[in-house]
UniProtKB/Swiss-Prot annotation:
Pfam families: Pkinase (PF00069)
Subunit and interaction comment: Component of the srb8-11 complex, a regulatory module of the Mediator complex.
Binding site for ATP: 33-41, 59
Domain of life: Eukaryota
Main location: nucleus
Record's keyword terms, sorted: Activator, ATP-binding, Kinase, Magnesium, Metal-binding, Nucleotide-binding, Nucleus, Repressor, Serine/threonine-protein kinase, Transcription, Transcription regulation, Transferase
Domain Protein kinase: 27-355
Required co-factors: Mg(2+)
Entry protein name: Serine/threonine-protein kinase SSN3
Family listed: Belongs to the protein kinase superfamily. CMGC Ser/Thr protein kinase family. CDC2/CDKX subfamily.
């Protein structure tokens, strides 16, 4: 009986593959938006429907793979690269599982997931802008700073999305301008949940699973000090950094990251330069304003490598960038508290006096703006999905037998991203 089941499994899978809708049969690819270590993100629209103008972002993940036959330089006798697929990345699994469950107006909406020819495609609603793009636009000398009403709306919406995540026992762990999308109607959408994780009942310590989280400029001080256990407060520190960047149009703590030794990946180096940038603005932390300071693994490194005692300088920094709103400064102080136990929570930040004073928070962050932000740069010199579709058709013609030669013939496709384009700042992790 078991033998018969095994024999009929192949034809069944083949029939299933023939009936499964492919990416290109459902969506028309307009071009690709960004590329990174995870794969690529494409702009697309539906085919053959009344809502053909509805736009989508298709995130195609690279498969975790490794090459074999190293004695032959990873190529077969015909010169084609030999690739063995080993599964789905942990970040892809996390993002798929979390996005399927989350439904909030300030979180990017997952529309569909398609598995096709060993590639995973996540279909999201499309957002025309992100905060990195908006900040970059306003950083041009001829353009005025971001209006206060726009900053207020953007930050409130970010906090609203973060509150929703935290209420559902999820922290994002990679909040930064490039991961904050904004729709054409001025609605914030927090994206890229690849590092997000549930924290109510973890099976192992958070540090064990991911030793390095949050992009360095937005990384909370407790993480820089090697915290093995941390709280959602790390997301609020990142929101504070984003608020400061919206006000000043440049990262407030722009340090240089010390890279992990490739020969000792278990050891994470102390990020001296990044911590230096923080103390220059916030002052040197002490046991008085951070009682648990000496409990962190990197406390000794902190004492030995950062010997200068800096006074608090955030108020002067705030004046230097031309800001004067006192409540906005108080909100910034609350988000950038050293002690995570004292730092503002997302729900408390939502009702901060800054958001209660005039001008009122607008649901549309672009309300009243007399400018239009440029649309995302779309790159059309890419045929990665097209190539994948051709492979899939070949796969089906052969009754499910994978044609390695056909697959490998597409490995030399030029998918380079113009990192120097002035209209769209490149990013490693973008929606």
């Amino acid at each position: 009986m078991a033998s018969n089941s095994i024999l009929t499994l192949g034809p069944f899978k083949h029939r299933k593959d023939l009936t499964r809708e492919s990416v290109l049969s459902t969506y028309q690819i307009i071009g690709y938006i960004a590329a990174g270590t995870y794969g690529k993100v494409y702009k697309a629209k539906l085919k053959n429907t009344a809502s053909a103008e509805q736009l989508f972002a298709i995130k195609k993940f690279k498969s975790d793979n490794h090459s074999s036959n190293r004695s032959h330089h990873n190529h077969d006798i015909n010169g084609n690269e030999i690739v063995h697929y080993t599964g789905i990345s942990q970040s892809a699994i996390r993002e798929m599982s979390l996005c399927r469950e989350l439904n909030n107006k300030n979180i990017t909406k997952l529309v569909d997931i398609i598995l096709e020819n060993k590639s995973i495609y996540m279909i999201f609603e499309f957002c025309e802008h992100d905060l990195l793009q908006i900040i970059h636009y306003h950083s041009h000398p001829e353009v005025k700073p971001i209006p206060q009403a726009t900053v207020k709306s953007l930050i409130w919406q970010i906090l609203n999305g973060v509150t929703f995540l935290h209420q559902n026992w999820i922290f994002h762990r990679d909040l930064k301008p490039a991961n904050i999308m904004v729709s054409s109607s001025g609605v914030v959408k927090i994206g890229d949940l690849g590092l997000a994780r549930k924290f109510n009942n973890p099976l192992q310590s958070l540090y064990t699973g991911d030793k390095v989280v949050v992009t360095i400029w937005y990384r909370a001080p407790e993480l820089l000090l090697g915290a093995r256990h941390y709280t959602p407060a790390i997301d609020l520190w990142a929101v504070g950094c984003i608020l400061a960047e919206l006000l000043s149009l440049r990262p407030i703590f722009k340090g240089e990251e010390a890279k992990i030794d490739i020969n000792n990946k278990k050891s994470v180096p102390f990020q001296k330069n990044q911590f230096q940038k923080i103390v220059e603005v916030l002052g040197t932390p002490s046991m008085k304003n951070w009682p648990a300071l000496n409990k962190y693994p990197e406390f000794i490194s902190f004492q030995q490598q950062l010997t200068t005692n800096y006074p608090p300088n955030l108020v002067n920094w705030y004046k230097m960038i031309g800001s004067s709103n006192k409540q906005c400064l108080e909100l910034l102080k609350g988000l950038l508290e050293y002690d995570p136990l004292v730092r503002l929570t997302a729900d408390n930040a939502l009702v901060h006096p800054y958001f209660l004073e005039l001008p009122k928070v607008q649901e549309n962050a672009f309300e009243g703006l007399n400018l239009k932000y440029p649309k995302r740069r779309i790159y059309t010199d890419d045929n990665d999905i097209i190539s994948n579709q051709a492979i899939n058709q070949n796969f089906k013609r052969h009754g499910g037998a994978y044609d390695d030669q056909h697959n490998n013939s597409n490995n030399n496709t030029n998918n380079s991203l113009n990192a120097n384009n002035a209209n769209n700042v490149p990013r490693k992790r973008a929606r």
